[in-house]
Amino acid sequence: NDLPAARKAVSRIVGRDTDALTAEGVTKAAVETVAENASDGVIAPLLYMLIGGAPLALTYKAINTMDSMLGYKNEKYLYFGRAAAKLDDVANYIPSRLAALLWVAAAAFTGNSAKGAWCIWRRDRRNHASPNSAQTESACAGALNVQLAGPAYYFGEYYPKPTIGDAVRPIEPEDIRRANRMMYAESLLALALGLVIRGIL
């Protein structure tokens, strides 16, 4: 109910300008962050841990953190930020797609729309400048039957980004909890899958 406080809180986890966000915009930003972090905060580290142990997982996190801090298309970080973003794109290419598929399964386990997650992922997974960011966001949008992404301001500059998903219904604060539940379910599925693979190998 406290929109200024919500804007301030979400500003700590997103790169876009939040000062003028509506309540719907704040909710969208939070849901998008949950979806994207399911990939680069959970699935990717687990995958790299499985492949190369702690050293590879830590290397991945260093690349991902560098992209988060510097990978914006503004004049100050244009060249260094571009290199960080490209490295992150390569590192997340496979994990993001695995995360999207696991999100579809997680949608089924949490009472959300697995069919919607699959269909919107297939349709909108390329609706982003990054080859990876829309992977889990599209699965999340489809699972919730809401529309994510769209135009946003970064450092005062307007970016006409495409939308992801269909606005079957308006997004609401409860969708943040729904997205979190799917992220937790996806994490458990990934952990179980990793343990099975580890046991086989």
Over which residues does each language-model region extend?
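Hydrophobic alpha-helical transmembrane segments
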Residues: 1-59, 63, 71-201
